[in-house]
Amino acid sequence: MSTPRIAFIGAGNMAASLIGGLRAQGVPAAQIRASDPGAEQRAKIAGEFAIDVVESNAEAVADADVVVLSVKPQAMKAVCQALAPALKPEQLIVSIAAGIPCASLEAWLGQPRPVVRCMPNTPALLRQGASGLYANAQVSAAQCEQAGQLLSAVGIALWLDDEAQIDAVTAVSGSGPAYFFLLMQAMTDAGEKLGLSRETASRLTLQTALGAAQMALSSEVEPAELRRRVTSPNGTTEAAIKSFQANGFEALVEQALNAASQRSAELAEQLGQ
């Protein structure tokens, strides 16, 4: 497949991450264009990635095959309505804005269009992201491949069968980094109370999190089995696990993810008006 021409509407952090991932994969600078209202941001992105960055959204999409909508959700309706006259029916629209349903994007863009809705997460900034993608009925197989390649430039990209699953993706991976940050904070605090220096407790916690994630990724067994293998009867790990479970750890996680998923659905209803 030939490299598509990609236009980014909005050149903030997530767009910059995607552009950087594409450039690292060898996508020519000439195939990428971006737009942004801020002169300072335009200069920064143009200088960092050697791509054409313009002020006009219409100019950015003029010859694009793929148009990536990377503006804040609150601004999406106005941006789409202003951009609609400049778009061609065959251009693939990829939205990385949280909470905006495909139907709303199509309505704001004026007609049924091929739309892929994505839910990336912040580790994409380090090209370690996890994204869920949903394609509407107008998206072709070739366009699905283009969208998948785009998000794969910053991590893993997994396709969803139902747009409603975006809420679950938001709960698991979209908001997920914050859950791990919270656990890291709690472990560091507890380690300090046990007598470690703040720096030592933090470094041990972060390296343990990284090592555990790498073990889980490289293993062919479920995390539950990995946990069992490192939990000796009557040992220190078992004592900690029993304390977690006695205090309802699994139920607490389920409740938290349900709350995030429900809030995602509520925001989609509000932002999609």
UniProtKB/Swiss-Prot annotation:
Gene3D superfamilies: NAD(P)-binding Rossmann-like Domain, ProC C-terminal domain-like
Subcellular location: Cytoplasm
Keyword Cytoplasm: yes
EC number: 1.5.1.2
Entry's Gene Ontology molecular function annotations: pyrroline-5-carboxylate reductase activity
Entries under NCBIfam families matching the protein: proC (TIGR00112)
Protein name: Pyrroline-5-carboxylate reductase
Lineage, broadest ranks: Bacteria, Pseudomonadati, Pseudomonadota, Gammaproteobacteria, Pseudomonadales
Encoding gene per record: proC
